[in-house]
């Protein structure tokens, strides 16, 4: 609660490449940690000067700089004030101010993993599908904000259900896109998406100090094959072995008809 984050102001921060590809915390967070380490290192030197102690004896914990083995301490806010109102300040060895920048270019990628399980009901007479239950367990490394991670999974699964069952770019014989607006492009609604059970395991990423992995795409990657596999499994005894996305009622009905015709011919 003592930190205010300035969003999207290029007058305040350096230009960045963006947070695409689930990079927000795995890349931006690491740059933030590097900058914070620079800040605390400099603040520790200022605290050592103010507390008349050696830099090696300064400890930082819970927003307080303290001298090891003593009751002498100084709050971070007081150190920051001293940095910008530098009375009795060692100007010859330390610049006033408490502002740092950091750049982080990851040497490797992060690899989240998980398991998604979907339960569906399929009406073989009409080809309609109802998604009844969905369970998603993912490993995104250390979870910094559980609410954000769960929200990413919920949103991703909803998108994945749409991709698996409803969404597609359709062109007519003249090449005209016929699904170019929300009037024609089918997307999942609340009644198409079930309540979800979301969980996580934690395997720390070895490529960054936070141990985090990207979570922005785990829902959209795991859910489409889970939905399609559930549909195919439900129709396995009818001879259906594969259905291309989106698995619309028409495609499912046709797949059942083709499979039954093949079985009858055998």
Mark where each language-model region is.
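Cofactor-binding beta-sheet edge motifs in enzyme active sites
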Residues: 1-266
């Amino acid at each position: 609660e003592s930190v205010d984050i300035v969003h999207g102001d290029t007058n305040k921060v350096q230009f960045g490449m963006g947070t695409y590809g689930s990079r927000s915390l795995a890349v931006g967070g690491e740059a933030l940690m590097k900058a914070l380490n620079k800040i605390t290192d400099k603040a520790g030197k200022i605290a050592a000067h103010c507390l008349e102690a050696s830099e090696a004896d300064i400890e930082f914990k819970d927003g307080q700089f303290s001298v090891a083995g003593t009751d002498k301490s100084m709050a971070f806010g007081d150190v920051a004030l001293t940095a910008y109102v530098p009375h009795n300040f060692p100007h010859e060895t330390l610049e006033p101010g408490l502002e740092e920048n950091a750049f982080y270019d990851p040497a490797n990628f992060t690899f989240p993993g998980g398991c998604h399980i979907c339960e569906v009901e399929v009406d073989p007479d009409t080809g309609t599908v109802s998604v009844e239950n969905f369970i998603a367990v993912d490993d995104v490394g250390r979870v910094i904000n559980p609410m954000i991670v769960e929200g990413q999974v919920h949103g991703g699964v909803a998108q994945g259900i749409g991709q698996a069952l409803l969404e597609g770019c359709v062109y007519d014989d003249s090449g005209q896109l016929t699904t170019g607006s929300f009037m024609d492009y089918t997307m999942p609604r609340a009644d198409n998406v079930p309540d979800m059970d979301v969980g996580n395991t934690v395997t720390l990423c070895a490529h960054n100090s936070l141990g985090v992995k990207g979570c922005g795409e785990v829902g959209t990657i795991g859910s489409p094959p889970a939905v399609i596999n559930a549909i195919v499994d439900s129709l396995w005894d009818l001879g259906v072995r594969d259905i291309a996305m989106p698995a619309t009622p028409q495609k499912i009905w046709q797949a059942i008809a083709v499979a039954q015709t093949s079985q009858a011919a055998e």
